C-alpha cells in the first residue's frame, strides 16, 4: 500500500441537526449524520463507512433523546480490494 492510498484525519462532526428529530429518534439520526458526514468528506459511499462501537456508545451515552451537539472522530481512508473504505473511531 502506497502513502497515497492511506489518509487519516480527526474530524469534528456537528450533530445539531439531530435535534430536529423527535426525542425518540435523535440518537438514531445522530448515527446517520455521522455516516453521511464521513462519506461526504472522504468521498466514499455510505456503505463503505465502518463505524467503531465507541462512536455508537458516545452518541447514545446520554440516552436516546439527549445526543451530544458534536463528536470528534478519528477516521482513516484506505483501499481494500480496489474499493475505498473509511474506518472511524472516537478521538480522545
Swiss-Prot record:
The modification N-acetylserine is found at residue 2. It comes from the Archaea. Keywords: Acetylation, Ribonucleoprotein, Ribosomal protein, RNA-binding, rRNA-binding. GO terms for molecular function: rRNA binding; structural constituent of ribosome. Signal peptide: none annotated. CDD domains: Ribosomal_L31e (cd00463). InterPro entries: Ribosomal_eL31, Ribosomal_eL31_CS, Ribosomal_eL31_dom_sf. GO terms for cellular component: cytosolic large ribosomal subunit. One of its GO terms (biological process) is cytoplasmic translation. The keyword Isomerase does not apply. Part of the 50S ribosomal subunit. NCBIfam families: PRK01192.1-1 (NF002258). Belongs to the eukaryotic ribosomal protein eL31 family. Binds to the 23S rRNA. Located at the polypeptide exit tunnel on the outside of the subunit. This is Large ribosomal subunit protein eL31. The gene is rpl31e.
Amino acid at each position: 500500500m502506497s502513502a497515497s492510498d492511506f489518509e487519516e484525519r480527526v474530524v469534528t462532526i456537528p450533530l445539531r441537526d439531530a435535534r430536529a428529530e423527535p426525542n425518540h429518534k435523535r440518537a438514531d439520526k445522530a448515527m446517520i449524520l455521522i455516516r453521511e458526514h464521513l462519506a461526504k468528506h472522504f468521498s466514499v459511499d455510505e456503505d463503505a463507512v465502518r463505524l467503531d462501537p465507541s462512536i455508537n456508545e458516545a452518541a447514545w451515552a446520554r440516552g436516546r433523546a439527549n445526543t451530544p451537539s458534536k463528536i470528534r472522530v478519528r477516521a482513516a481512508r484506505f483501499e481494500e480490494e480496489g474499493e475505498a473504505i473509511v474506518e472511524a473511531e472516537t478521538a480522545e
